[in-house]
UniProtKB/Swiss-Prot annotation:
NCBIfam families: gatB (TIGR00133), PRK05477.1-2 (NF004012), PRK05477.1-4 (NF004014), PRK05477.1-5 (NF004015). Heterotrimer of A, B and C subunits. InterPro entries: Asn/Gln-tRNA_amidoTrfase_suB/E (IPR017959), Asn/Gln-tRNA_Trfase_suB/E_cat (IPR006075), Asn/Gln_amidotransferase (IPR018027), Asn/Gln_tRNA_amidoTrase-B-like (IPR003789), GatB (IPR004413), GatB_C_1 (IPR042114), GatB_Yqey_C_2 (IPR023168), Gln-tRNA_amidoTrfase_suB_CS (IPR017958). The keyword Ligase applies. The gene is gatB. Belongs to the GatB/GatE family. GatB subfamily. It is an enzyme of class 6 (ligase). Its EC number is 6.3.5.-. GO terms for biological process: glutaminyl-tRNAGln biosynthesis via transamidation; translation. This is Aspartyl/glutamyl-tRNA(Asn/Gln) amidotransferase subunit B. Allows the formation of correctly charged Asn-tRNA(Asn) or Gln-tRNA(Gln) through the transamidation of misacylated Asp-tRNA(Asn) or Glu-tRNA(Gln) in organisms which lack either or both of asparaginyl-tRNA or glutaminyl-tRNA synthetases. The reaction takes place in the presence of glutamine and ATP through an activated phospho-Asp-tRNA(Asn) or phospho-Glu-tRNA(Gln). GO terms for molecular function: asparaginyl-tRNA synthase (glutamine-hydrolyzing) activity; ATP binding; glutaminyl-tRNA synthase (glutamine-hydrolyzing) activity. It comes from Caldicellulosiruptor bescii (strain ATCC BAA-1888 / DSM 6725 / KCTC 15123 / Z-1320).
Length: 480
């Protein structure tokens, strides 16, 4: 029997506010344990929360950017459960009246557009953090993260594969970064993904029993966890077993998911309205004010790159998939008119060094090559000061040292040779040294010509103008 995977996501994104959602404590990452907290975020008796207006604005902006409806009236609720990192024994969240609802994000999979529904986006406070490896006799609790504002983005169960899920998450992350709603640093926990997954016979309209997977700290982990869990559930069903509705923890080093607890239902949390906070009332003028502040989003920027710069759709998609990459590219083309070359260098060498160094696209500003320096390198090729081959050598040194390309070219004497007489001497030497290749060329073997070009470049240490080499070499070979 062929099975279909059904996936829905719960994505938690930390909002980029300077202070927490209900108090004035800083949201800055790190710090000594329990130094970024106060009686409000640690739930001491007698304190009252005050809602951070900026957190609501960011949530509305996220909703507008993902095509959601914005609730004119919503409220906050207490979600009651006991866990050591939750000092009040309840979390202030939203239950039946979320701030944003009925949205969508369009993604492209194998050239086909697909719409993924956003069921709701609501605001809530983060919990603390348990540290299990710093004390032999038990676990320690750090409340620095307690009360940091979050949005939880809940999708409809519209995703059907690990690849669709990865593409969706990359698109969502880009939207949150473009709007500056969240920095989405997964390594710091500011973007966290829970995956709800079930399988069903292909063609069936009924959903199977779902499991929820947690502890997914990278998109790679999400992809691996989905593929593992789908296989596990199919094996259970094919062996005559029953899939248990439960929460499972992903163990990335082992590549397996492990049972944590049976899945809770809404009634297990005993939701009730938060008595210490008034309802959230949003009027049209506030929504429009926030809408006007939404910057150019990835899809809009991609279309502009295609129309304005004439870039291929794929290139435009890669260059706009990360705000940091797009900003780097746009800064680069301020200093060069060769936009296509800038795109090629970004898509090729820049992406390669990011991958080689294990850097995320958002970390592009950490490399030593600045956008204006990349533009200078492109200009050196365009004005025939250096060849493309030499440019790649210069690029490597720029990456290692951060030096300007002009400085490297001057220091190493890499200026391109355009003197016809100098190139002619190198051509004659290559012909004299390789009579067999000359004979092969005369007998119609085109590869021999490429070999001879390579020999000329070797003699000139890669500095000869390739076009002149081709031209002069053909002229000399015709004379033989």
């Amino acid at each position: 029997m062929e099975y279909e995977v059904v996936i829905g996501l719960e994505v938690h994104a930390e909002l980029a506010t300077k202070s927490k959602i209900f108090c004035s404590c800083t949201t800055e990452f790190g710090g000594e344990p329990n130094t970024h907290c106060c009686p409000i975020c640690t739930g001491m008796p007698g304190v009252l929360p005050v809602l951070n207006k900026k957190a609501v604005e960011y949530a509305i902006m996220a909703g507008l950017a993902t095509n959601c409806q914005i609730a004119r009236y919503s409220k906050q609720d207490r979600k009651n459960y006991f866990y050591p990192d939750l000092p009040k024994a309840y979390q202030i969240s939203q239950y039946d009246l979320p701030l944003c609802y009925n949205g969508y994000i369009d993604i492209e999979v194998n050239g086909q557009k697909k719409r993924i529904g956003i069921k709701r986006i609501h605001i809530e406070e983060d919990a603390g953090k348990l540290l299990h490896d710093q004390w032999e006799e038990g676990s320690l609790v750090d409340f620095n993260r307690c009360g940091v504002p979050l949005i939880e983005i809940v999708t409809e169960p519209d995703l059907r594969s690990s690849e669709e899920t990865r593409i969706f998450l990359e698109k969502l992350k880009a939207i949150l970064q473009y709007t500056e709603v969240s920095d989405c640093k997964m390594q710091e926990g500011s973007l966290r993904v829970d995956v709800n997954l079930s399988v069903r016979p292909k063609g069936s309209k009924e959903f199977g029993t779902r499991t929820e997977m947690k502890n997914l700290n990278s998109f790679r982990s999400v992809v691996r966890a989905i593929e593992y869990e789908a296989r596990r559930q199919i094996e259970v069903l094919e062996s005559g077993g029953v899939v248990v509705q439960e929460t499972r923890r992903w163990d990335d080093p082992k590549g397996i998911s492990l049972s944590m607890r049976t899945k809770e239902e809404a009634h297990d949390y005993r939701y009730f309205p938060e008595p210490d906070l008034p309802p959230i009332v949003v009027d049209d003028s506030w929504i429009e004010e926030i809408r006007k502040r939404i910057p150019e989003l990835p899809d809009q920027k991609k279309e502009r790159y295609i129309k304005e710069y004439g870039l291929p759709e794929y290139d435009a998609g890669v260059l706009t998939s990360s705000k940091a990459i797009a900003n780097y590219f746009e800064e680069c083309i301020k200093y060069t008119q060769n936009i296509k070359a800038a795109s090629n260098w970004m898509m090729g060498e820049i992406m390669r060094i990011l991958n080689d160094k294990g850097l995320e696209p958002e970390e592009i500003n950490n490399i030593k090559i600045k956008p204006n320096q990349l533009a200078s390198l492109i200009n050196l090729v365009d004005n025939k000061t250096i060849s493309n081959t030499i440019a790649k050598q210069v690029f490597e040194e720029m990456f290692e040292t951060g030096k300007d390309p002009e400085v490297i070219v001057k220091e190493k004497g890499l200026v391109q040779i355009t003197d016809r007489n100098v190139i002619l001497e190198a051509v004659k030497q290559a012909i004299a040294n390789n009579p067999k290749s000359v004979e092969d060329y005369k007998n119609g073997k085109d590869k021999a010509f490429g070999f001879l070009v390579g020999q000329v470049m070797k003699i000139t240490k890669g500095k000869a103008n390739p076009q002149l080499v081709n031209e002069i070499l053909r002229e000399e070979l015709e004379k033989i």
